[in-house]
Regions:
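Active-site-adjacent helical/loop segments in soluble small-molecule enzymes
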Residues: 6-66
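Phosphate-binding loop/pocket of nucleotide- and phosphate-handling active sites
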Residues: 56-94
Length: 94
């Protein structure tokens, strides 16, 4: 059964673009590397890595405390991984 989502149920938080398109701060790169190590999920530094970084910052701030369901949609970012492969070299989970 399809899920209905009303526009007023969607919140877009756009304050985590960092230095700009494809320009990551060291803090974001460290987060992406640590996230890959801990969760086994690779995030590109152009889109999804910045988005997950922002999402976790919002969780820490309590932005979703009153929410019953919160969804993070990982949209891919595969091609953004190739130029950033050195971030993931030698990573092991754990």
């Amino acid at each position: 059964e399809p899920v209905a989502i009303r526009p007023e149920e969607v919140e877009i938080i756009d304050g985590y673009v960092g230095r700009g398109y494809a320009l990551s701060r060291q803090e974001e790169l460290n987060f992406i590397r640590d996230f890959a190590r801990m969760e086994g999920v690779l995030l590109d530094p152009v889109y999804t890595g910045k988005c997950m970084y922002g999402f976790t910052q919002e969780v820490k701030k309590g932005s979703f405390a009153g929410s019953k369901n919160v969804l993070f949609l990982h949209t891919g970012g595969l091609f953004g991984l190739f130029p950033a492969r050195e971030l993931f070299t030698g990573l092991r989970k754990g």
